[in-house]
Amino acid sequence: MIALIQRVSQAKVDVNGETIGKIGKGLLVLLGVEKEDNREKADKLAEKVLNYRIFSDENDKMNLNVQQAQGELLIVSQFTLAADTQKGLRPSFSKGAPPALANELYEYFIQKCAGKLPVSTGQFAADMQVSLTNDGPVTFWLNV
């Protein structure tokens, strides 16, 4: 399971021209689910996202997690994170989870995070437009 997290000052996701998820300061989490993923991996990744210390403390050191920084999460499914790009000039999605499993684990991941802080989401399998202001820029690839 993969999360590409970006520290943002704001982010939103639109579907068919309508904003369906929006946050202020926090993390945009682009979530990719692979074939071998399960709830145990989702638990581990949620804990890592919630506790990853990438927000500045009073000394301007990356020492606070999103909860301590009183931030929010915008969680968006992105199957392309599971792409195999090692061969050729076209990505292969053979590592990606089937849609039913991917949706189940995406929803489970959201539930794990929603109990801890405000969460907005995208729409699974939709064509979405995501806009953000990356604060830093600060971006990390988390893989469990």
From Swiss-Prot:
<keyword id="KW-0378">Hydrolase</keyword>
<comment type="function">
    <text>An aminoacyl-tRNA editing enzyme that deacylates mischarged D-aminoacyl-tRNAs. Also deacylates mischarged glycyl-tRNA(Ala), protecting cells against glycine mischarging by AlaRS. Acts via tRNA-based rather than protein-based catalysis; rejects L-amino acids rather than detecting D-amino acids in the active site. By recycling D-aminoacyl-tRNA to D-amino acids and free tRNA molecules, this enzyme counteracts the toxicity associated with the formation of D-aminoacyl-tRNA entities in vivo and helps enforce protein L-homochirality.</text>
</comment>
<dbReference type="Pfam" id="PF02580">
    <property type="entry name" value="Tyr_Deacylase"/>
</dbReference>
<dbReference type="GO" id="GO:0005737">
    <property type="term" value="C:cytoplasm"/>
</dbReference>
<keyword id="KW-0694">RNA-binding</keyword>
<comment type="subunit">
    <text>Homodimer.</text>
</comment>
<dbReference type="GO" id="GO:0019478">
    <property type="term" value="P:D-amino acid catabolic process"/>
</dbReference>
<dbReference type="InterPro" id="IPR023509">
    <property type="entry name" value="DTD-like_sf"/>
</dbReference>
<dbReference type="GO" id="GO:0106026">
    <property type="term" value="F:Gly-tRNA(Ala) deacylase activity"/>
</dbReference>
<keyword id="KW-0963">Cytoplasm</keyword>
<dbReference type="GO" id="GO:0043908">
    <property type="term" value="F:Ser(Gly)-tRNA(Ala) hydrolase activity"/>
</dbReference>
<keyword id="KW-0820">tRNA-binding</keyword>
<comment type="similarity">
    <text>Belongs to the DTD family.</text>
</comment>
<dbReference type="GO" id="GO:0051500">
    <property type="term" value="F:D-tyrosyl-tRNA(Tyr) deacylase activity"/>
</dbReference>
<dbReference type="InterPro" id="IPR003732">
    <property type="entry name" value="Daa-tRNA_deacyls_DTD"/>
</dbReference>
<protein>
    <recommendedName>
        <fullName>D-aminoacyl-tRNA deacylase</fullName>
        <ecNumber>3.1.1.96</ecNumber>
    </recommendedName>
</protein>
<feature type="short sequence motif" description="Gly-cisPro motif, important for rejection of L-amino acids">
    <location>
        <begin position="136"/>
        <end position="137"/>
    </location>
</feature>
<dbReference type="GO" id="GO:0000049">
    <property type="term" value="F:tRNA binding"/>
</dbReference>
